[in-house]
Amino acid sequence: MSEVLRRANNALSSVKQYQSLLNHFAATQSISKTKALHCHVITGGRVSGHILSTLSVTYALCGHITYARKLFEEMPQSSLLSYNIVIRMYVREGLYHDAISVFIRMVSEGVKCVPDGYTYPFVAKAAGELKSMKLGLVVHGRILRSWFGRDKYVQNALLAMYMNFGKVEMARDVFDVMKNRDVISWNTMISGYYRNGYMNDALMMFDWMVNESVDLDHATIVSMLPVCGHLKDLEMGRNVHKLVEEKRLGDKIEVKNALVNMYLKCGRMDEARFVFDRMERRDVITWTCMINGYTEDGDVENALELCRLMQFEGVRPNAVTIASLVSVCGDALKVNDGKCLHGWAVRQQVYSDIIIETSLISMYAKCKRVDLCFRVFSGASKYHTGPWSAIIAGCVQNELVSDALGLFKRMRREDVEPNIATLNSLLPAYAALADLRQAMNIHCYLTKTGFMSSLDAATGLVHVYSKCGTLESAHKIFNGIQEKHKSKDVVLWGALISGYGMHGDGHNALQVFMEMVRSGVTPNEITFTSALNACSHSGLVEEGLTLFRFMLEHYKTLARSNHYTCIVDLLGRAGRLDEAYNLITTIPFEPTSTVWGALLAACVTHENVQLGEMAANKLFELEPENTGNYVLLANIYAALGRWKDMEKVRSMMENVGLRKKPGHSTIEIRSNSVDTR
């Protein structure tokens, strides 16, 4: 370095020589030599406007924002080059407001420094990223008044800007007047249509591009394949894949990743795996795509096998990969595999990521390992909402209502702001508590914090009031939704129907159901279950049968085991056991334990030992460890005085090591909920 400065001291007698050396430092990204020469300029008293301008440009090209900014601001007058380089630097660093400020300063100098075809693309990008339509129109207006309105690089920047604004029609207007479109122009339109949800327009643009014989590049393929995946257009996706092979565009990993993702979105795991297996190089995105594909397909074993293969190949996972695998372990109740993933996350030093912490808490909760939930939570960041929401949801899932409410109070004390996900997890705890005073407290909180504007929160509160038996309050909230949201979704209708049903008000439940159908909301599986249950608990036999026939006639694809269970229960409560059994024999799939359980319960009520024994034997096969089935059959024998048969059933329970689980309840003592067991 000293030799460089010695030569500089001897040889640098002109500004051009300084500029030549600085240009070399910029080209080689040598920030240390630039700083040394900067020091030499200052100590040697050779500071001039031209040298300061070149130094600013050099720092900018080397990515040293602080020095570039300081020198630029100290210059009494900047050159066009320095303006352009500094604007570019700010845009590339994501400092869009700073880029616009420099542009405004540039424009304010008038004819001394006029923006050119290098300036406008970066300014248009800054406006687009800031989503400032007003600024974008000003920039476009200046471009049209300049000589650069027909410059294809400037026009391409305008296309991207308008697509960022979501103004696809304005982008298309610019595209249509372009005389010299290049592949970037077409790619910008395709990707812009995709990002703004105009899938068919993206397809049309791609077809037009191919018909115009434009040479496709990697960006074209990466822009087009997500469109095929979103539309689940497998044929088009395969055609694009064919073009990739014909034009030899598969050399970049981004293209192969896009192909894998497209086939996954189209539901073709086999073709996605075919591409995956033949990839010479795979990055973490590739692995994550395939693992997510298997998890969404419910194929836990293959997802975990890929995880093991990923570890073997030494690929470092990201948070999304591990969180996806942990979630699938939770859904499949594979706690041991979940623990292995937990250890892997620790070894890979990604354990402290909020996504992973949250997914681990949820996984352990689903696997009934609440102790491990709290262990993960104790080490998690308490400043983020995710872990709090997960631990509250885990407590509710495991019937730890008091713990869930306590955690929510602690969350608020520690000034962590709950979000709608937190409250969606919490409201079932208030419903399980069925305490009107507590329900009113959470209602007040939701109103004060503005969460009542959320349809999800309002639906949860309808359920809470329904469980408390305050159906007037539930219906009042239900009616208030109309004013805020203009329409009610099927989940909200279902909550109110369920509320009336659980309190034996079948007439109102059916009335709400029919009102829902008339309003144009399509019932789903859950709303039918709620309405049929309401009929069963209210003794509305004919109404329930009519509703069931309506479902089979108009919504046959929705019919599930739980709907048949409702009708068996309905007929059983009315003493029509033979009809209930005949219905079971007509079920188009294998009857589940809930169906036979409904019949057995009815047989206990009406002391029908023949059908009771038949139902019990089916249940012993389907769920041999359920003590309730043995108890119900024993109760039938006891009611008929068949004590020996009852003792045989009791002996069967003892032989398989079953014990009846004791019940428990929750009582309130001085505003605190206490679980009694």
From Swiss-Prot:
InterPro entries cross-referenced by the UniProt entry: E_motif, Pentatricopeptide_rpt, PPR_At4g14850-like_plant, TPR-like_helical_dom_sf
Pfam families linked to this entry: E_motif, PPR, PPR_2
Keyword Mitochondrion: no
PPR repeat start-end pairs: 48-78, 79-113, 116-146, 151-181, 182-216, 217-251, 252-282, 283-317, 318-352, 353-383, 384-418, 419-453, 454-488, 489-523, 524-554, 560-590
A Gene Ontology BP annotation from the UniProt entry: RNA modification
Keywords: Repeat
Organism: Arabidopsis thaliana (Mouse-ear cress)
Region annotation Type E motif: where it falls in the sequence: 595-670
Entry's family note: Belongs to the PPR family. PCMP-E subfamily.
Protein name: Pentatricopeptide repeat-containing protein At5g39350
Recorded GO MF terms: RNA binding
NCBIfam families: PPR (TIGR00756)
This protein's record includes keyword Repeat: yes
